[in-house]
Amino acid sequence: MNAATKLPGDVGPIHFVGIGGIGMSGIAEVLLNHGYRVQGSDLKPTRITRRLEELGARVFVGQRPENIEDAEVIVISSAIKPGNAELDAARARGLPIVRRAEMLGELMRLKSNIAVAGTHGKTTTTTMVATLLDAGEFDPTVVNGGIIHAYGSNARKGEGEWMVVEADESDGTFNRLPATIAIVTNIDPEHMEHWGDFDTLRQGFLDFVSNIPFYGVAVCCTDHPEVQALVGKITDRRVITYGFNAQADVRAVNLRYAGGVAYFDVALQAEGTVIEGCSLPMPGDHNVSNALSAIAVARHLGMKAEVIKTALAAFGGVNRRFTRVGEIDGVTIIDDYGHHPVEIAAVLKAARQATEGRVIAVHQPHRYSRLSSLFDDFCACFNDADVVGIAEVYAAGEDPIPGAGRDDLVAGLIRHGHRHARAVVGEDDLERLVREQTRPGDMVVCLGAGTISAWANGLPARLQKGAA
């Protein structure tokens, strides 16, 4: 009998503990589309779990030992710890326990792969690469960390050779993914609760790009000093650089913004050619940078300039990445996932480029530990906002840390020179702030990884109701 060398087709049911999570659900969906028997549990039903049920998954609400009675394999994320009823029951039965990234890696072994890593921009970049490959008729399989508007999902099964995945560095498992093409957007000190220190994180990214095969390529943004330093350490593998700087292989030039659209040309310095007249229907230098990485991959795979330009111009974006949720009385409401100071600064700069009015930022800090460790950075990242509202910290299970609360951040912003920062004590107060501070032409940007998204999505109806 020959031992299996890849994921057997008859394995299962495969049970996902926390199947509704954005990272878990995409893998579950692709497994379903490949004909595997998939089930899972989550604490409450959501749009994501309902979609998985429609695709054939069995979904349990709540996590109990009896949920895994029929399971043969258990998939967990780093959020699932000993003491979880299903994990403990699975271990008692001797079932295989598979980390999320390990299962993603098994799927990747079926294809050639493009893996997108970086502290910020992974989800948008993954979507851009998938969009271009789709337009180039590569028909890629995709597993993303956000809902792609064009798909209505964070995953799709393609029939082509290529698979595009978001490589999450948060728990250190991303450098086990078998990437053929590895993209690195940027490297900042984040997820230190896992990595311990910045040098270890740097080594993690070096391991990630060093794992590509000799026929692969690393695609790296050398506008970022840490990534440029990483490029200097990559040996015996091909590297394509991108960015705005004059040394980048794939470089954006002649960038301008009009009506929230980025217009630019792309200098392909190794080819000695320029792709003129590119446009991207979302503002922000960071988004143009992300697009450059996708263009680099597309050209590496032989895509023509006109196909690339057409696909970029029609880019539909990703949920919660500068997502326009409504416009009331000339005031635009934006929902964005940004919760790190670098992300917040980039989003607010994009808002400045997208509106001629004022920018009102409302932020819900995510985790006391992040706010505490990056406190000075948070105090300096809102300069492009005319008005800043700070909501209570979304704890994500953490205990409060002295000096790292909502009012501390408001005081810190004022101390660092912000002219108009205040606390927002709830949805009613958010509505009050917007009514008091906005006028036609302004933009309200709600930022954070917690419940602030629900506030943003509910705000247009609240404002409309009050105006009626």
From Swiss-Prot:
Locations listed in the record: Cytoplasm
Domain of life: Bacteria
One of the record's GO cellular component terms: cytoplasm
Main location: cytoplasm
InterPro entries linked to this entry: Mur-like_cat_sf (IPR036565), Mur_ligase_C (IPR004101), Mur_ligase_C_dom_sf (IPR036615), Mur_ligase_cen (IPR013221), Mur_ligase_N (IPR000713), MurCDEF_pg_biosynth (IPR050061), UDP-N-AcMur_Ala_ligase_MurC (IPR005758)
Signal sequence extent: none
Molecular function terms, GO-annotated: ATP binding; UDP-N-acetylmuramate-L-alanine ligase activity
GO biological process: cell division; cell wall organization; peptidoglycan biosynthetic process; regulation of cell shape
Catalytic activity: UDP-N-acetyl-alpha-D-muramate + L-alanine + ATP = UDP-N-acetyl-alpha-D-muramoyl-L-alanine + ADP + phosphate + H(+)
Described function: Cell wall formation.
Cross-referenced Gene3D superfamilies: Mur ligase, C-terminal domain (3.90.190.20), Mur-like, catalytic domain (3.40.1190.10), NAD(P)-binding Rossmann-like Domain (3.40.50.720)
Entry annotated with the keyword Nucleotide-binding: yes
Enzyme Commission number(s): 6.3.2.8
Organism: Roseobacter denitrificans (strain ATCC 33942 / OCh 114) (Erythrobacter sp. (strain OCh 114))
Listed pathway(s): Cell wall biogenesis; peptidoglycan biosynthesis
Name by which UniProt lists this protein: UDP-N-acetylmuramate--L-alanine ligase
Family: Belongs to the MurCDEF family.
HAMAP family (UniProt xref): MurC (MF_00046)
Binding site for ATP: 118-124
Keywords: ATP-binding, Cell cycle, Cell division, Cell shape, Cell wall biogenesis/degradation, Cytoplasm, Ligase, Nucleotide-binding, Peptidoglycan synthesis
